[in-house]
UniProtKB/Swiss-Prot annotation:
Belongs to the universal ribosomal protein uL24 family. GO terms for biological process: translation. This is Large ribosomal subunit protein uL24. One of two assembly initiator proteins, it binds directly to the 5'-end of the 23S rRNA, where it nucleates assembly of the 50S subunit. It comes from Pseudomonas fluorescens (strain Pf0-1). It holds the Pfam family KOW. InterPro entries: KOW, Rib_uL2_dom2, Ribosomal_uL24, Ribosomal_uL24_CS, Ribosomal_uL24_KOW, Translation_prot_SH3-like_sf. Part of the 50S ribosomal subunit.
Length: 104
């Protein structure tokens, strides 16, 4: 079970976007996350009339390493760590500071 999943709200704790918050769009296999509106890079694309792609400079989200982000706890308005707890035979994610469920 992953500590950070898609649609989690995270806060960046290291790097050029430190302190910014965003929502996880995609979790990649190599422990990296794509976060909406953060870690933007410019990519130069060639026009491709066959697929309808217009050329130019496109800004898109690049992946961040999971160690540079922390899950955002809306109750405390701070970055938090994630732990696991077994309730009713199911393993759930909980915030370390409040011991409340992340997905609640």
């Amino acid at each position: 079970m992953q500590k950070i999943r898609r649609d989690d709200e995270i806060i960046v704790i290291a790097g050029k976007d430190k302190g910014k918050r965003g929502k996880v769009l995609k979790v990649l296999a190599d422990n990296r996350l794509v976060v909406g509106g953060l870690n933007l890079v410019k990519r130069h694309t060639k026009p491709n009339p066959m697929s309808g792609v217009q050329g130019g400079i496109v800004e898109k989200e690049a992946p961040l390493h999971a160690s540079n982000v922390a899950i955002f706890n809306g109750e405390t308005n701070k970055a938090d760590r994630v732990g696991f707890k077994v309730e009713d035979g199911k393993k759930i994610r909980v915030f370390k500071s409040t011991q409340k469920a992340v997905d609640a």
